[in-house]
Amino acid sequence: MKGTLSVLCLVLLVSVLEAAVTKPKFGDFIGCLRYRTSPENPITDAISFADNTTTFLSSYVSYTKNKRFSTPNYRKLLAIVAAKHVSHVQATVVCAKSNGIQLRIRSGGHDYEGLSYMSSVPFVILDMYNLRSITVDVSSKKAWIQAGATLGELYTNVNDVSQTLAFPAGVCATVGAGGHISGGGYGNLMRKYGITVDHVIDAQIIDVNGKLLNRATMGEDLFWAIRGGGGGSFGVILSWKINLVDVPKIVTVFKVNKTLEQGGTDVLYKWQLVASKFPESLFVRAMPQVANGTKRGERTITVVFYAQFLGRTDALMAIMNQNWPELGLKHEDCQEMSWLNSTLFWADYPAGTPTSILLDRPSSPGDFFKSKSDYVKKPIPKEGLEKLWKTMLKFNNNIVWMQFNPYGGVMDRIPATATAFPHRKGNLFKIQYFTTWFNANATMSSLSQMKELYEVAEPYVSSNPREAFFNYRDIDVGSNPSGETNVDEAKIYGSKYFLGNLKRLMDVKAKYDPDNFFKNEQSIPPVRVM
């Protein structure tokens, strides 16, 4: 391990020195940072350089969640600025822009393609994890949350003052609020309350000129864009003001497995017909996954059904028996618990795990993984499901699964143009494809197998365009080089992520960042659309 780290540090040092030679303004950038920050809030301690390789490597890896992008040949990283004060963010934006250095903004590091912490041109990471304050006002049912705070921290802070308030966001506790909220993050409350951006009522953002703006000073067009269009194309999100939502003191959850031998395909087919029509207080996720069979060395598909009901077991059983008896849900399958404890259930923590784990911030990279997404408008026929199972079983020794996340409820009633997030009425469910592997040598074969699974699903999902979820970043749906933005290419991936909202997003980008400073391989281009 020590040898690997030494080599990694050496390559980092070489790459940074090479970048510094090719970017003589890097020294001016550092000088600019010091000039633009005050002695009361010095920025020096927030900067990690390659000449301090232990700190530099630790800073990079701590918020690198996909191991595919933790190897040195992927990056030309000059420095990491882990901002500790708003002035650090402002200075980093102004100084990077004035010195021609690309900026990548990282909140929690969960960008699936690493675009928040990678580039093929010399760049600086602006890390937001130190800006993590959360203020909850119970009387108004509102909260301010900084971009570097995690969902686990938000849920815990809310629960500390009220056990009957929550926020409709995701189930991964370590996800950062900055990117998750701006991309339209969702969770098991979406059928009842919608998604994150539907509950944002104010925001603070640093614009391309280093100015601190809120909803009143940024204008409604920019405020619309950062709610679902991804904040990283328009500026640096500092914080969000959100409306909290009501939940009962006790919710009910269940987890039921159905193998193919137990009729898993038939049960899942019926799920497609009923999941989006359940009462909006009920969310049932279906998760087909590769599992060990009954015989040694045999692999099969098990469909796992996870559910949350905003009520008690008896009421849930009545709904299930009437609408979906095929699942065979039993009273003993159900567990009643607080909403906060239900977040542990959804994250697959063992029973009895203390809720304090929601505050943990793992400091090592995750596994190698690849994810993709789809939206489904009509039920996938059983023969289509069987083709998907056959393809999933081709994966080598990977962990591989799909998540079917139901729509319906309030999602059908919010207009596609209400925010920049467009995927609303007309969807039965959203699919997430996911595979994990544990050896870098398996990367190419794993990516190829994921591509095959995605191709097999094509006849059964949305088309023209084939829609995709922005927060499940997927470079395969289209991309630009790190230092360029081709509008035609941007329209390819942009139309999949944002559908008819892309034109308005491009107009907003042209107004607020006409020189395209805030860019990455899948950013919004600054083009006025007539």
From Swiss-Prot:
Residues 73-247 form the FAD-binding PCMH-type domain. PANTHER family: OS08G0158400 PROTEIN (PTHR32448). There is a cross-link at H110-C172 (6-(S-cysteinyl)-8alpha-(pros-histidyl)-FAD (His-Cys)). Residues 1-19 form the signal peptide. Disruption phenotype: No effect on the levels of ICN metabolites. It is an enzyme of class 1 (oxidoreductase). Coiled coil: none annotated. It is found in: Secreted, Cell wall. Keywords: Cell wall, Disulfide bond, FAD, Flavoprotein, Glycoprotein, Nucleotide-binding, Oxidoreductase, Secreted, Signal. Pfam families: BBE, FAD_binding_4. InterPro entries: BBE, FAD-bd_PCMH, FAD-bd_PCMH-like_sf, FAD-bd_PCMH_sub1, FAD-bd_PCMH_sub2, Oxid_FAD_bind_N. GO terms for molecular function: FAD binding; oxidoreductase activity. This is Berberine bridge enzyme-like 4. The lineage of its organism: Eukaryota, Viridiplantae, Streptophyta, Embryophyta, Tracheophyta. SUPFAM superfamilies: FAD-binding/transporter-associated domain-like (SSF56176). One of its GO terms (cellular component) is extracellular region. It comes from Arabidopsis thaliana. Belongs to the oxygen-dependent FAD-linked oxidoreductase family. The keyword ATP-binding does not apply. Glycans are attached at N52, N257, N292, N341, N441. The FAD cofactor is bound via a bicovalent 6-S-cysteinyl, 8alpha-N1-histidyl FAD linkage. Binds 1 FAD per subunit in a bicovalent manner. Probable flavin-dependent oxidoreductase. Disulfide bonds join C32-C95. Transmembrane segments: none annotated. Its cofactor is FAD. PROSITE patterns: FAD_PCMH.
